[in-house]
């Protein structure tokens, strides 16, 4: 599973090419390189760290090292499939709802674990947000994590080990990721793609993590949605309530456009793997794909909220005359105009409306209703009679 490399870690372990991307987490990089070199991989890992610390990147890198015949060259067909999320032996699970994992998701996972790998010698199961494994789901998973087949590796991730049920933590090797500074996060984005520092800063504000920021910058559709949202924000004070409701509807429609790319990727992956799948497995994949589309739609709305929050924070800087560069420099004119028409308390009220929208989304309130109420509340807050600043 390992490959000799011209790269080495700080403790001189051979470093597979796939692990070179973990340079911002040298301790993690060294731990995984050593485990691969000594053929002592754990059967279950728990990656813990703040969002944006590179847990997802590390999970993909480890999967590449394990499944690639060259030990993680990051260039072969298997590695490319893993990078794109289409490898049939790498299964990524995310919570089916804002409240956590469904017991049915875990039962499907357990049933799949017993099946042989399709392309490689091993299978990897990545369980994101392991802190959202509720007691019934966690209990169903315990024995499988504790005694998985020899060809199976679990990689769980969470913000902290204390947020995960102790029974799960005790069955995993915990790997801690340090929090990246803003400068390191921007540098990671700029290493990954050709982006300016300002583009990286804007993308980070919209998405929260370097990995998602890269995806954002590579998506013309998502960048267009941001531009549309800036226009809505700029016209909010001059538009009437009907215009605001129309804007909310248009934003919801725009948020659905990127889902077409997700559907096409799902269909491509299904076409590549359907010869290996039983009819029952096909149904499981289709159900998982539907859950992914629902989750992606929700994440698109959350991204809109983050963009609005970033714009409002820039307005707040202007209202308070803080000597600090705004994030959304490409919307500086709009930000200055809104700041001249409102005051600090109004902006704080608008920010509270964004937080309330996040709360409502977490409780499965309709996305369109959530946006409508939020935009109306932001308009109301910002148009309060100006106070002395």
Predicted segments with their positions:
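Loop/turn-to-beta-strand initiation segments
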Residues: 119-124, 149-155
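Conserved Walker B
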Residues: 129-133, 160-161
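Conserved phosphate-interacting/catalytic interface
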Residues: 308
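Conserved alpha-helical scaffold flanking the Walker A/P-loop in AAA+ ATPase domains
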Residues: 31-35, 103-124, 132, 136-143
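AAA+/P-loop NTPase substrate/partner-engagement loops
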Residues: 74-101, 163-164
């Amino acid at each position: 599973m390992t490959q000799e490399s011209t790269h080495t870690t700080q403790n001189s372990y051979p470093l597979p090419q796939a692990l070179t991307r973990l340079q911002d987490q040298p301790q993690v990089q060294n731990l995984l390189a050593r485990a691969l070199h000594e053929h002592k991989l754990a059967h279950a890992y728990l990656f813990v760290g703040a969002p944006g610390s590179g847990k997802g990147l590390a999970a993909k890198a480890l999967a590449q090292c394990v499944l690639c015949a060259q030990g993680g060259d990051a260039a072969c067909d298997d590695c490319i499939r893993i990078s794109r999320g289409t490898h049939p032996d790498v299964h990524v699970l995310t919570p089916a709802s804002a409240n956590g994992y469904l017991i049915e998701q875990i039962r499907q996972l357990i049933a799949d674990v017993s099946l042989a790998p399709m392309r490689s010698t091993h299978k990897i199961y990545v369980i994101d947000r392991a802190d959202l494994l509720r007691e019934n789901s966690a209990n169903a998973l315990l024995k499988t994590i504790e005694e998985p087949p020899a060809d199976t590796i679990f990689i769980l991730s969470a913000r902290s080990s204390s947020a995960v049920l102790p029974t799960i933590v005790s069955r995993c090797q915990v790997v801690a990721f340090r929090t990246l500074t803003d400068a390191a996060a921007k540098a990671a984005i700029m290493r990954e793609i050709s982006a300016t520092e300002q583009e990286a800063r804007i993308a980070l504000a919209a998405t929260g993590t370097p990995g998602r920021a890269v995806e954002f910058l590579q998506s013309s559709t998502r960048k267009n949605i941001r531009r549309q949202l800036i226009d809505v924000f700029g016209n909010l004070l001059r538009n009437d309530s009907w215009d605001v409701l129309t804007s909310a509807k248009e934003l919801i429609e725009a948020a659905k456009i990127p889902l077409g790319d997700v559907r096409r990727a799902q269909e491509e992956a299904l076409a590549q793997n359907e010869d290996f799948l039983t009819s029952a497995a096909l149904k499981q994949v289709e159900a998982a794909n539907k859950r992914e589309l629902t989750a992606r739609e929700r994440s698109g709305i959350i991204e809109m909220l983050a963009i609005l929050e970033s714009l409002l924070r820039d307005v707040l800087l202007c209202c308070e005359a803080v000597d600090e560069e705004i994030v959304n420099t490409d919307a500086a004119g709009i930000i200055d105009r809104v700041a001249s028409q409102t005051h600090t308390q109004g902006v704080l009220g608008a920010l509270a409306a964004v937080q309330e929208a996040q709360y409502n989304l977490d409780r499965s309130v309709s996305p369109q209703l959530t946006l409508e109420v939020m935009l109306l509340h932001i308009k109301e807050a910002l148009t309060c009679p100006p106070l002395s600043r």
